[in-house]
Structure formats: C-alpha cells, structure tokens
C-alpha cells in the first residue's frame, strides 16, 4: 500500500481544518567581531577574576557546531595565557566520536579545534572521576583531566535535544 493510500484510509473519518503556509522570520543580531565582543564580556566576568597565574584551566568543548568556535576558543585561550594560566582543551561530548579519546579529538579537529591553531594541548581521555550520586542513586561522573584542573570553562551551544524532551536534555548539563 502506498503512503498516500494509507493516510487517506487512516484519515477517512477525520475532519481536518484548512491549512495555510506560513513563514516566520526573526531578527538575528550578528556579531561583527566575535573576538572583541568576547574579550569585552570576559572583562566583566567575576569567575575570570578567580583565575590566577599558573592555574590550570580545562576548556570543555562539545561537538555542537558553533559559528566562530575556533575564534571563541582562541580568544579565551589568549586571555587565559595573558593571566599566566595554563589552559588546555578537554572534549566534552558523551558518545560522539565513537566514545573514544581519539574519536573525540577527531570531532574537535573537524570543528577547527586543533593544537596547532590554538597553541594548547587537547587532552582527551575516557577516564572519569565519580563526584557524587544523583537523587535517584546513579553515579555522577566527570572527565578526570577536567576534575584535576583548577578551573573548568565550558564552551557550549544550548539547544533542545533532538530526540526527547525532559527537565534535563543535552548539552551544557552533560558537559559539566
């Protein structure tokens, strides 16, 4: 049975309302200089004031495509180095990249995140530290390399999960 016939049979007794094709356009402000905008915002960030000379800073980077991601990372790393900190990248992406250390480095590479461009190491490992338990009794773990850093800064795009809805879906909560 063809799809059309199936739908006609299923909807035979259903009265459908009239439909109209509509399109919604929203203004999307553009940053013309993302590096300058980020540097300006970080000047006012109280958390950045806590980072001192020789502190290690794990920059948690996910697998989501973010416009200007490498520029964002490059700017943040430059500011951290100016403070005398020792930044490094940790992949923060769950099962992406085949849930392997090299696979996750490869995902970052395809997003333009490389040790050569950013001048810092990408420290990828599947080792974790258990930091507690959830209210339901499940272990809560985090990347071991990030756990041992003095500070963690996630770079993330926050969006709804594509497969399910719930109070905790994807992205930033998983990264932390």
Describe the residue ranges of each PLM region.
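Short glycine/serine/threonine-rich phosphate/pyrophosphate-binding segments
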Residues: 66-73, 98-99, 161-164
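An acidic, phosphate/nucleotide-engaging active-site surface
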Residues: 103-168
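Glycine-rich phosphate/diphosphate-binding loops that line cofactor/substrate pockets in enzymes
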Residues: 42-58, 81-82
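Short glycine-rich or small-residue beta-strand-to-loop segments that form or flank ligand, phosphate
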Residues: 56-65, 88-95
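Short connector loops at secondary-structure junctions
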Residues: 90-106
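Gly/Ser/Thr-rich active-site loops/lids in small-molecule metabolic enzymes
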Residues: 174-176
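N-terminal amphipathic/basic leader segments beginning at the initiator methionine
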Residues: 1-37
């Amino acid at each position: 049975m063809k799809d059309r016939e199936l739908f006609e049979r299923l909807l035979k007794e259903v009265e459908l309302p009239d439909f109209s094709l509509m399109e919604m356009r929203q203004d999307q402000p553009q940053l013309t200089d993302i590096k300058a905008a980020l540097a300006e915002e970080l000047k006012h960030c109280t958390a950045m004031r806590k980072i001192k000379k020789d502190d290690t800073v794990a920059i948690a980077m996910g697998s989501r495509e973010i416009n200007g991601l490498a520029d964002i990372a490059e700017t943040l790393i430059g500011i951290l180095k100016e403070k005398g900190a020792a930044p490094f990248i940790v992949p923060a992406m769950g099962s992406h990249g085949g849930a392997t250390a090299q696979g996750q480095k490869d995902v970052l590479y395809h997003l333009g995140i490389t040790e050569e461009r950013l001048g810092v190491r990408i420290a990828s490992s599947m080792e974790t530290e258990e930091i507690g338990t959830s209210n339901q009794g499940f272990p809560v773990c985090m990347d071991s390399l990030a756990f041992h850093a003095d500070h963690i800064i996630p770079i993330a795009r926050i969006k709804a999960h594509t497969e399910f809805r719930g109070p905790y879906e994807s992205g930033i909560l998983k990264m932390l």
